[in-house]
A protein has these predicted regions:
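A residue-level detector for a conserved hydrophobic packing site
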Residues: 12-16
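Short helix-loop "hinge" at the ATP-lid/N-box region of the Bergerat-fold HATPase_c
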Residues: 22-24
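Short beta-strand/loop element within the Bergerat-fold HATPase_c
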Residues: 30-41
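Short alpha-helical Gxxx[C/S/T] motif in the catalytic ATP-binding
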Residues: 75, 79
């Protein structure tokens, strides 16, 4: 199988931009960002604070795991809303000191 999503271009741009911006804003100096696309989905991974964030609240509007300049607490809520609208799953997990956001088919 192939990970294939058909959606409005503006929604696709908003989804990917919000996840990428989140990875940049909440990274550490000298950190890294990895984007992986597989047949099962797309994953954004980044270095950052060295502990997991609050999975229960991370996709809520105005939630901020860390106070960073340039962050409104809306990006992940928007990404979550777009995923739900498009019948996609988005989940957060912390693995090998990386913050991971994975989008997959429902």
């Amino acid at each position: 199988g192939v990970f294939k999503v058909t959606m409005n271009e503006s929604l696709a741009v908003a989804l990917l931009t919000n996840l990428l911006k989140n990875a940049f804003v909440h990274n550490i100096d000298g950190g890294h960002i990895r984007i992986t696309i597989t047949k099962n989905g797309i994953t954004f991974r980044n270095s950052g604070v060295e502990h997991p964030l609050d999975k229960e609240h991370i996709f809520e509007r105005f939630y901020q795991g860390s106070k960073k300049e340039g962050s409104t607490g809306l990006g992940l809520a928007i990404a979550d809303s777009i995923c739900r609208l498009q019948h996609l799953n988005i989940k957060y997990y912390f693995e090998q000191n990386e913050h991971c956001f994975e989008i997959s088919q429902s």
